[in-house]
């Protein structure tokens, strides 16, 4: 019997560090990487570029089915590069406006259905690290290792604040905290695929942990399950 391509899912709320950890883990293992949250950001970004309203479900469905996107390793070996329609949009899709749009389109069942098969197609040998909000519950329910990464809203706002300040953005910590709390409420209360840990997920609170500490804990779980071969 052919063994399925192994998948490690890392789910959690915005700012929990899941994207950074997932990219580093994929690099360490030499596996493929899926930033599913980026797909929703990419859709919101592409919708704006193509003049598609975020409430136009049919137009969003068509756009989602034809998104031309690739994930690749950054040249410095840290993180990932996201290419949309031949253009590097790694930084362009990370602002709060695009993030809010991503959360809005992610709440639409027709959009989630359109992107579901696209996400599953990233499951290729030798393995896949998938980060998002419903990777372990909806997209890859058979994944042999599921992580649910959390952190306090205050810590997540602080991390985002430092990240944006380092980029030269003019940001307000209180506003970021409010936005994160609002997004948490949207993501956990939505009717389709709400943000929640899978029943068999390992829950990690990263509030007081460094990225390296989180990574090492996950690598220990990978070794225990002999997933890396």
Swiss-Prot record:
- The enzyme class is transferase
Molecular function per GO:
ATP binding; CMP kinase activity; dCMP kinase activity
Q: Which GO terms describe its cellular component?
A: cytosol
Residues annotated as coiled-coil are: none
* Signal peptide residues on this chain, from the entry's feature table: none
Q: Which UniProt keywords apply?
A: ATP-binding, Cytoplasm, Kinase, Nucleotide-binding, Transferase
Question: What biological process terms from GO does the record include?
Answer: nucleobase-containing small molecule interconversion; pyrimidine nucleotide metabolic process
Subcellular location per the Swiss-Prot or TrEMBL entry: Cytoplasm
Q: What is its main location?
A: cytoplasm
Reaction(s) this enzyme catalyzes, per UniProt:
CMP + ATP = CDP + ADP; dCMP + ATP = dCDP + ADP
Pfam families, from UniProt? Cytidylate_kin (PF02224)
Provide the residue positions that the database annotates as binding ATP: 12-20
Enzyme Commission number(s): 2.7.4.25
Q: What family is reported?
A: Belongs to the cytidylate kinase family. Type 1 subfamily.
What PANTHER family does this protein's entry cite? CYTIDYLATE KINASE, CYTIDYLATE KINASE/PANTOATE-BETA-ALANINE LIGASE
Name recorded for this polypeptide: Cytidylate kinase
Which gene name belongs to this protein? Answer: cmk
């Amino acid at each position: 019997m052919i063994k399925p391509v192994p998948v490690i899912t890392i789910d959690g709320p915005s700012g929990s560090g899941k994207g950074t950890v997932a990219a580093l883990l994929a690099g360490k293992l030499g596996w493929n990487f899926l930033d599913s949250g980026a797909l929703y950001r990419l859709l919101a970004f592409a919708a704006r570029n193509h003049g598609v309203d975020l409430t136009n479900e049919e137009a969003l469905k068509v756009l989602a089915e034809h998104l031309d996107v690739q994930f690749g390793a950054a040249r410095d070996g840290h993180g990932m590069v996201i290419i949309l329609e031949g253009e590097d949009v790694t930084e362009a899709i990370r602002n709060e406006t695009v993030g809010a749009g991503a959360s809005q389109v992610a709440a639409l069942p027709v959009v989630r259905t359109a992107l579901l098969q696209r996400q599953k197609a990233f499951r290729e040998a030798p393995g896949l690290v998938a980060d998002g909000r419903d990777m372990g519950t909806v997209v890859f329910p058979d994944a042999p290792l599921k992580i649910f990464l959390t952190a306090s809203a205050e810590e997540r706002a602080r991390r985002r604040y430092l990240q944006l300040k380092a980029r030269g953005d003019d940001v307000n910590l209180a506003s970021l905290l409010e936005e994160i709390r609002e997004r948490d409420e949207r993501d956990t209360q939505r009717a389709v695929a709400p943000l929640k840990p899978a029943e068999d997920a390992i829950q990690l609170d990263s509030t007081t942990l460094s990225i390296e500490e989180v990574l090492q804990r996950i690598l220990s779980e990978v070794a225990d399950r002999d997933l890396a071969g």
